[in-house]
């Protein structure tokens, strides 16, 4: 429930606007509302971390606004909590007016929703389901350079679920569209909220079944098979992509040792 801060409230402070968060000194603020000059602001508690509440304040600051990605290197759990705040702040920012009748909406006091008192429509935060998949061929893993990524990082294949698709169908389609290969033995591994801006990554592993790699230049700069002990630059620890790669490397190494 939203409340006006008196000043003595304490905890972690997710001050967010336009998919960015306030990171003074490169860290998420922690302490009382008064310490961070937040008294009088409207806030909502969005969870807890290390025994202290986490508060969302939907407002930008003139300085020290940064991407929530910075928290990945500090603490994965804190990154996930701050990412929740970023997604909620963006939801509120993009749902000021009703999409049906155009009237101004208000935030629900009892749930995470926006309400239109004119036509009685109710809106909830949108989540975009995505798949991400690691594919193994013997002692090798398929890795690719995505056009949307900077630098020389290689990672596994990923894509959005389309209307009417199952997750399994999405994996097969995305792999075919991006690499032109077939897969088998598809199995679910894990999931990770990804606040860029509001995705939910659902991770899979699969085995190579056939075909030659022909990467889609609209999506990928490069794609290829990499031996488990000759890997390129990888995604940072804490990402589900890195976990998939590390888990697949274990299988690749076991395959090499058994075949050797």
UniProtKB/Swiss-Prot annotation:
The reaction(s) this protein catalyses: a 5'-end NAD(+)-phospho-ribonucleoside in mRNA + H2O = a 5'-end phospho-adenosine-phospho-ribonucleoside in mRNA + beta-nicotinamide D-ribonucleotide + 2 H(+); NAD(+) + H2O = beta-nicotinamide D-ribonucleotide + AMP + 2 H(+); NADH + H2O = reduced beta-nicotinamide D-ribonucleotide + AMP + 2 H(+)
The keyword Hydrolase is annotated on this UniProt entry: yes
Record: residues binding a divalent metal cation 2: 174
Binding-site residues for a divalent metal cation 3, renumbered to this chain: 174, 178, 219
Domain Nudix hydrolase: 125-248
Cofactor notes: Divalent metal cations. Mg(2+) or Mn(2+). Binds 1 zinc ion per subunit.
Necessary cofactors: Mg(2+); Mn(2+); Zn(2+)
Residues noted as binding substrate in the record, renumbered to the chain: 69, 111, 124, 192-199, 241
GO annotation, biological process: NAD catabolic process; NADH metabolic process; NADP catabolic process
GO cellular component, one term: cytosol
EC number: 3.6.1.-, 3.6.1.22
Record keywords: Hydrolase, Magnesium, Manganese, Metal-binding, NAD, Zinc
CDD domains, sorted: NUDIX_NADH_pyrophosphatase_Nudt13
Binding, a divalent metal cation 1: 158, 178, 219
GO molecular function annotations of the record: magnesium ion binding; manganese ion binding; NAD+ diphosphatase activity; NADH pyrophosphatase activity; RNA NAD-cap (NMN-forming) hydrolase activity; zinc ion binding
Binding site for Zn(2+): 98, 101, 116, 119
Quaternary organization: Homodimer.
Role: mRNA decapping enzyme that specifically removes the nicotinamide adenine dinucleotide (NAD) cap from a subset of mRNAs by hydrolyzing the diphosphate linkage to produce nicotinamide mononucleotide (NMN) and 5' monophosphate mRNA. The NAD-cap is present at the 5'-end of some mRNAs and stabilizes RNA against 5'-processing. Has preference for mRNAs with a 5'-end purine. Catalyzes the hydrolysis of a broad range of dinucleotide pyrophosphates.
Family: Belongs to the Nudix hydrolase family. NudC subfamily.
Protein name listed in UniProt: NAD-capped RNA hydrolase NudC
Source organism of this protein record: Pectobacterium atrosepticum (strain SCRI 1043 / ATCC BAA-672) (Erwinia carotovora subsp. atroseptica)
Gene encoding the protein: nudC
């Amino acid at each position: 429930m939203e409340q006006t801060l008196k000043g003595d409230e304490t905890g972690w402070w997710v001050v967010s606007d336009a998919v960015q968060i306030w990171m003074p000194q490169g860290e998420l603020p922690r302490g009382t509302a008064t310490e961070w000059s937040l008294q009088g602001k409207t806030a909502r508690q969005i969870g807890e971390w290390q025994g202290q509440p986490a508060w969302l304040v939907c407002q930008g600051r003139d300085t020290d606004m940064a991407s929530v990605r910075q928290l990945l290197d500090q603490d994965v759990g804190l990154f996930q909590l701050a990412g929740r705040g970023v997604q909620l702040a963006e939801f509120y920012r993009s749902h000021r007016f009703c999409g049906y009748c155009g009237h101004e909406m208000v935030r629900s006091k009892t749930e995470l929703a926006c309400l239109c008192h004119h036509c009685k429509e109710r809106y909830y935060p949108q989540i975009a389901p995505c798949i991400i998949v690691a594919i193994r061929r013997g002692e090798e893993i398929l890795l690719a350079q995505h056009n949307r990524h900077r630098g020389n990082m290689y990672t596994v294949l990923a894509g959005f679920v389309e209307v009417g698709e199952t997750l399994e169908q999405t994996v097969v389609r995305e792999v075919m569209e991006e690499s032109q290969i077939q897969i088998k033995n598809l199995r679910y591994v894990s999931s990770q909220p990804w606040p860029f801006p509001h995705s939910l990554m659902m991770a899979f592993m699969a085995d190579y079944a056939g075909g030659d790699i022909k990467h889609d230049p609209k999506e990928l700069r490069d794609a290829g098979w990499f031996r488990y002990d000759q890997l390129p630059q990888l995604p940072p620890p804490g990402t589900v992509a890195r976990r998939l790669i590390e888990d697949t490397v274990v299988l690749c190494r076991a395959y090499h040792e058994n075949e050797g």
